[in-house]
Amino acid sequence: MVLEQDLDPFVGGNWMNSAYKGFTFLSATWLAPNIYLLISGCLQYFYEVRKRSHYFHFRRFWTIWLKSLVIMVLLFTHIYDCYKTNESVWNVLSIITYFLALFLHVVEQPTLRIPMASLLMFWLFKFLASALVLLLRPNYTMFPMLNVVPSITFFCSLVCLLAEIYVPPANRVWYPDDAAELEETGLRPSRFTYANIFSRISFGWLSPLMKFGYRNYLTESDAWSLPPAERSSNLTIVFEKNWISHAKKKKSSLYMWGVLFLNHWKLTVVIIVLKLVQDVVAFIQPNLIRKIVIFVSSYSSEHPQPPQVGFSLAIAMFLTNVVQTALLQQYFQLGMVLGMRWRSELITAIYRKSLRLSSAARQSRSVGDIVNYMSVDTQKVCDLTMFLFVIVSGPFQIVLALTNLYHLVGYGALSGAFVTFLLFPCNVVIASIFKRFQNRQMKNKDARSQFMTEIINNIRSIKLYAWENIFLQKLLQLRNTRELRMLKKIGIVNTIGNFTWLFAPILVSAATFGTFIVLYGKTRVLSVDIVFACLSLFNLLQFPLTMLPIVVSSVLEASVAISRIYGFLTAGELDSNAVQRYPANKEPSGVCLEIKKGTFSWSGPGQNAAEPTLRDIDFVARRGELCCIVGKVGMGKSSLLEACLGNMQKHSGSVFRCGSIAYAAQQPWILNATIQENILFGLELDPEFYEKTIRACCLLRDFEILADGDQTEVGEKGISLSGGQKARISLARAVYSRSDIYLLDDILSAVDQHVNRDLVRNLLGSKGLLRSRCVILSTNSLTVLKEASMIYMLRNGKIIESGSFTQLSSSPDSQLFQLLSEFSKKDTASSTGADTPLSRSQSVITSSTDVTSSASRSSDTVSNYPKATIKGTGRIRKRLTDEDNVKATGQAAEKMERGKVKWKVYWTYFKACSLFLIFLYFLFIIGGIGMNVGTNVWLKHWSEVNTQLGYNPKPYFYLGIYTLFGLLSCALISLSSLTITVFCAIKSCRYLHDSMVKAVLRAPMSFFETTPTGRILNRFSSDVYRVDEVISRVFMFFFRNLFQIVFVLAVICYSSPMFMILIVPLFFLYRYNQVYYTQTSRELKRLDSVTRSPLYAHFQESLGGLSTIRAYDMEDTFISENDIRVDTNHRIWFLYFSSNRWQAIRVEAIGALVVFSSAFFGVLSAVRGNPNSGLVGLSLSYAVQITQSLTFVVRQSVDVETNIVSVERMLEYIGLPSEAPSIIPDHRPPEGWPSHGAIKFDHYSVRYRENLPLVLNDISVNIKPQEKIGIVGRTGAGKSTLTLALFRLIEPTSGDIQLDDINITSIGLHDLRSRLAIIPQENQAFEGTIRENLDPNANATDEEIWHALEAASLKQFIQTLDGGLYSRVTEGGANLSSGQRQLMCLTRALLTPTRVLLLDEATAAVDVETDAIVQRTIRERFNDRTILTIAHRINTVMDSNRILVLDHGKVVEFDSTKKLLENKASLFYSLAKESGLI
């Protein structure tokens, strides 16, 4: 190829003709874009554009018309030029190229969201080529066209290039699929999907959001949708395919890594290539520094280099920085995208697995463990991708550094390499210790988190039993003696590792320089250019040496997480063939469900399990029949229903099911949604049948009471509802589903007696709504048995008898006959909580209208209504995040602070750290960085002396001082790290955590009932983690980088005083960028935290209702809901880490300007006659470090603000309103109080919360010692509120309660609650031993506990357990039946020495035989005590001394049973009549 200065191609006017003088450089430049487009354009069209659908809406794309017009101008120009010059070959090629460009533009814009890369690069190359031709080509005035063609091409290419990179406004939607998404979700498509290559490199696509966020506070709705490639539903398809075909078949978690990489191998390759190219570019800088130092040094000699060489090197430094920044930010961005994809895939896989988990696998893992897999472990794997590829890049950087060092110092580099590799074993040892400590710490955190979860879930019982201090001490022991002690060890190991990594470059440089002196000291000079080039290489070498051990440790930590996730994903699943499914049987008495010789257990095959739970079961249920299952507590009634659902391990036999199933669990599972959404459960609303359903389930009256009716937000686990309301909503959900088979687990135990009868009449009776369906009911209620077509009686997991009610009741040998004979005078309908709890929005019933539905009187059945259909959206509920507005009865939205965090929060945190320790930290960090600068200044002085003298005087003296400076610098910086990350962090986190847990335990019950459990636990997990480990580390790096920048700028200003002119404008530019970025990034970070809570809450909620979800075949709907929540969080997170890249590329551009300025002023100073190569080398070696330091300071300033929010949130809880004091020293009740048990309510009124109506209104009652009082009333009358009032879970509005003549508000809560005994509605149990559950204070002996267990009919069961009193109770008492947990509550009462006992339906969940035993025990053991019995079954209080009748929160009757029954106008008489006792 020939250059233009040697050969002129324009002779004779034919400027593109290569036939005259040969093919030239400009000819190639002119033709290259055409050839590029012909090849790449055709390939991209056939492989990308042609496969897509076309939406030809030209009128909406004005850029098409503009580009078409410009291309027409170019075509006309070239055709005319071809005609004038008679040159056809090159013009024809250009004409063909422009026709191809026109065609591609026409099909491009309505088809692709982003410009075709081939077209974009074509116009860029064409623009540069025409500019180059205009600059280098001679100006021939003889041939005007020779100027016209490149000039027109130049301007037309520029227009097309600008039109091609044009991005549509953010408020415009251009494509039909985007419009559909906008209509469905309300979210605008991500600007990323419209971004061209330049916009993606510069992250300009994010600028509209940054601008909006700078001027406004961002909300979730402002965030754009997630790009389609990042959505969990799309990612899961590929993951599950590869998981099934690879990892699932193997027996090692290593294959799971393979699946994760296999899913995104193309992206992985791109990331690695980007990082390696960036490494190569980064190592150009030391060579440029050396050349600039040599250039400056040349002006101290007789042969200075031309000035343009120096300025060119300065420009090269700037361009190298810019290119390196672009590559590095793309590497980080794609790494985060890969991590986000992994997290999405793992979360969705864990969620899907949890829906299929077998009972044995589920029992071996607590809810907290599974949630940790989803939250903690997936995040660890995700975070790994940020620096994972340093494993490849690190060795490559070390090789590059040592290779460059070899060229500079010869074999001296080998000693540096030796020291480098010598440090690896040390780092590996530190990493292994760190990993071991981290694993222990994870277990400590899990234990604390699990224990805290139990405290919050059982807080009502803890307060009622006055156990706050016991649980507090246990929690603080887990926290302070285990977790914080391990945190201190981790901090010390981390500090030792930091010192090693900081000192490594000093050791390497000392070894390198020392070897150089030994080998070449007499022949070569350790000059300035060698020293600072080496120094720059040592700085580059510090990153891989520092990061490799950290990355190895992170990989090991992530491997542990992957192993845990892999173990979960490969755990046992439900046997899909356990139940054989067939279409619905439409025959009038056709078999709907049948079990033949079935044996079932809760443990899987091959496990060391006890005897099967159910044995030799033969069971048949037919269409149109009501089948009842009866038996004592723990005999297997609920297990039989679970076996019908396929949730138990089937060992033998077969289960057949015909049609769909509806299931109502014994413990109703209620979604955190509206009542209507709970009933519809993802089905379309049928107004007529919906009204029929709520009438049949006796819910109309409840809707009248609730402020928002069926649109009431029920809160987490239905906390704003009573037990009876939960049960009827669960029942209504089953009825509304219009299924073929109904499995109802003891639903009648949760309602009042008159409601019980209505439900039987409306639903289960011969004229009930479900009479045409197959209904299977487990029950302890003998009343409903009269309606049963078939009764099965269970004992010890076997069906001991079955038959119709007539058959069994007429047989003297029948077990059922014996029960009927013994309890024929008792109504055994049971209940566990019909009264409204503390969190009701309203307790006063405004109407006593009989709600007996028309369903009970009509001929309607479920069969008369069409089958239910699932909503088109597949959504259970609308609400996703706490940002949505909630109704008056819903839970309050989580408070999200906006704007800057108040300085008071920082001050409080620093005081918690200790101001003296903070002072020491600043002393150490400033001294360390100053000493580091001194190290390099000394190196500069040493090299200058060598250069001036021409040899190496006193080399070991200079080397020793250099090493000493480096050692002191590393020691001081490490001490600063130890001070802030260990001593300050532990001191502050102990104060904040302990204060918060004390405040939460002392908070009133209203706080727990208006705050979701997940939100509280988030404070004790995520926020505590940030205070423990993140905040101190962020502060450390922030101040280290800040002082580093200050010292660097000082060095640059000292070496180049003219640089001070730029400091002010650069500072304002930097500050503006920081503020511009901080506002948006801070809000995105907060939104990220807010959108994570609903994701974890949904997961926890789903784990609590697995049986219900599977029974209704709603797995796909809940999976879809989970995917939506994952994507909701990820679209915020995607914008957050993209905003980091947006900021980094702009701040690092400022850093590149600093580097350029340092180099430029150094060159300029040399050219003007003031050369100082030592100062220039020193300033440049520091300037190249400032680029990332500037970025880190901005980033960490945001990290400081976003993480200090955790302190703010903890302080918010520390400042929670508190209950009354536990103990009032001046008002301690006397020993043995209450000694009599006299209770007096004196004009007592109370409401649950402010702005709510009174639930008890002017109650005046005098209860004598040892008197037995029955408390009755309709639903919502205020019965259970009396319990809350007596225990002061709610405080009076007016009036008071006196207990043995002491006003209970005048004494401490612990003194009051510990002197009362209660058997509450909620039969809560704690994880631990039986003994710890019964007597956590350890006040009773084993003999006393056994005696109490015997009285509570639990002794025989406990004795069958392997550990006896020390047998383990699993989380929430899951390994105990509901009745057994209720009897444990009775045992606690028996162990409490008190004169007052409150029973809130103590035997609701037990069978009638056990009920009789318990009632006898209460009469015998508590005969000398005052007993208040809140009754939902009227028969349980018929032997009371007096009956207290409540209505609308007022006392309407209070007299003996006999007198009230004699008065037929009394409310008690009507209640007794409704219950069938009269």
UniProtKB/Swiss-Prot annotation:
Gene behind this protein: abc2
Keyword Iron-sulfur in annotation: no
Modification sites for Phosphoserine: S839, S843, S863
Transmembrane annotation, as ranges: 26-46, 66-85, 91-104, 117-137, 155-175, 260-280, 311-331, 388-408, 412-432, 496-516, 540-560, 911-931, 969-990, 1034-1054, 1056-1076, 1148-1168, 1173-1193
Similarity remark: Belongs to the ABC transporter superfamily. ABCC family. Conjugate transporter (TC 3.A.1.208) subfamily.
GO molecular function, one term: ATP binding
Name of this chain's protein: ATP-binding cassette transporter abc2
Sequence ranges assigned to domain ABC transmembrane type-1 in this UniProt record: 268-557, 918-1202
The protein's role, per its UniProt record: Involved in vacuolar sequestration of glutathione S-conjugates. Together with abc4, required for accumulation of a red pigment (ade pigment) in the vacuole of a mutant affected in the adenine biosynthetic pathway.
Limits of the ABC transporter domain: 593-821, 1239-1473
Keywords of this entry: ATP-binding, Detoxification, Glycoprotein, Membrane, Nucleotide-binding, Phosphoprotein, Repeat, Translocase, Transmembrane, Transmembrane helix, Transport, Vacuole
Statement: the UniProt record of this protein carries the keyword Transmembrane: yes
Native source organism of the sequence: Schizosaccharomyces pombe (strain 972 / ATCC 24843)
GO terms under cellular component: fungal-type vacuole; fungal-type vacuole membrane; Golgi apparatus; membrane
Enzyme nomenclature, EC number: 7.-.-.-
